[in-house]
Amino acid sequence: PHNLDLLQWICGLPCRVRAFCHNGKWHQIEVEDDVTAYLEFPNGATGVFVTTTADAPGTNRFEITLERGKLVAEHDKLTFFELEQSERDFCFTATGGFEQPAGHEVTIELDGKNPQHVGVLNAFAGAILRGEPLVADGTEGIRGLELSNAMHLSSWTDQTVTLPIDEALFLEKLNEHRKASKVKTEVTEVTFDTSDSYGSKVSDNTDKGGVKA
């Protein structure tokens, strides 16, 4: 869910969602493990969200295409490909059939700080003890949940849904899935180490914008 939080935090909530959520497609589970969603935003922008738990080595990429360039966050780096003129202006003035607007790539320098869970918890404690600002308040959590619920509802009904969603219909469909849930009869106990997924990342190479664990 973290990438959904980032998506709506940075881009805002979409107004329409069409999603395809596959439950137990790759694992013996009753929740989604393969999702593709198409998003439409109030300003006319569109987006695509794709995720799966069966992709190795996996992709963690956040891309925003703008009129004057493109932002890409991937491999702990933020890159901006800056165009010399607006793509919209170039589109209607270029005379060649396959020309592209000129531009150059810029690696955005980061501060090297990426505290992740530790930073969120420290900010939460600081807000209680000293009134310090949170990384994100409860409203952001509700918005991320709204987007997740919209994707589920779209997939369950096989329709495009508008936001805010019909909460009564969502609860109805959720309860249908609850009733259809089955208890696993064969369970294998395992020890699952989550230490590598919890903590913070601090760069020792801030001049290049890189972040190392």
Give the role of each language-model region.
Residues L6-W9, A123-A127, A150:
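Residue-level signal for well-ordered alpha-helical scaffold segments within enzymatic catalytic domains
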Residues D34-T36, T59-R61, R68, M151, ...:
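Short, acidic/polar N-cap/turn motifs at the starts of alpha helices
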Residues G12, G126-R130, W156:
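Residues at helix-coil transition
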Residues I142-R143:
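C-terminal structured "cap/appendage" subdomains that terminate the fold
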Residues L147-T157:
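Short arginine-rich
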Residues P1-T46, T51-P57, E63, T139:
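Rossmann-like dinucleotide-binding domain that binds NAD(P)(H)
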Residues T36, F41, L66-T139, V161, ...:
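C-terminal glycine/acidic-rich active-site capping loop/insertion
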Residues N3-L4, H117, L121-N122, S148:
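A general structural signal for well-ordered alpha-helical segments in protein cores
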